[in-house]
Amino acid sequence: MRLRNNANAPLYLKSQHEYIINDPHLLKDNLGKIFKNPELPLYIEIGMGKGDFIIENALRNQQINYLGIEKFPTVIVKAHKKALKHKLDNLAMICFDANKILELLNSESVDKIYLNFSDPWPKKRHAKKRLTHPCFLEKFAVILKQNALVEFKTDNENLFMYTIYDVLLKDLTKYEILFLTYNLYTLVNNVELLKNIPTEYEKKFVMQGERIKKVNFRFLKNNQ
């Protein structure tokens, strides 16, 4: 269910200086103004939603910097208010459209990308809006470091099948699948489940008996 639009959200974000990045150029030019330890690995979540996943990651892994990207101001306000309950030097958030991600981040500057429960855009004519469409993946390949991973989770069967069969397996010269499951929560004692941090949507889907699908992949050397 979508949140009711908060007309004051853009103004709220502009007034905030803790966790919120209001100058996108800082991510390319001066990470030291964003993170206390800018030399740490950088993991990003595209479409961070209300922030449960990325905030918990930042709490558990102080040795990694986390950047949450979300294009809807109303949603990122919710995430920001959750983050304010903690004192974290390794977390930042920005309201930004992933279509323009090459304007936001330098080449080979990112160590991992998380795509969690992205909008499935079910209609064929909207396929290019899917975050696992090749037009997005080509951009992700530019900002990712050598051998860096993309981790993709979804409850949506059609989006997952599209990602696996129409994208990743369609060109084996571009992508390498390192982990794949059609039902993450059945993998008892598997490291992927043991380390899993659920998003707010994921918790609801699991309670409803939905199968959570996941794939980890990377871009092959000659295509980065």
Swiss-Prot record:
Catalytic residues (positions): D119
Keywords, comma-separated and alphabetical: Methyltransferase, S-adenosyl-L-methionine, Transferase, tRNA processing
Transmembrane segments: none
Positions bound to substrate: K123, D155, T199, E200, Y201, E202
Function, as annotated: Catalyzes the formation of N(7)-methylguanine at position 46 (m7G46) in tRNA.
NCBIfam families referenced in this protein's UniProt entry, alphabetically: PRK00121.2-2 (NF001080), tRNA (guanosine(46)-N7)-methyltransferase TrmB (TIGR00091)
Alphabetized GO MF terms: tRNA (guanine(46)-N7)-methyltransferase activity
Official protein name in the record: tRNA (guanine-N(7)-)-methyltransferase
Natural source organism: Ureaplasma parvum serovar 3 (strain ATCC 700970)
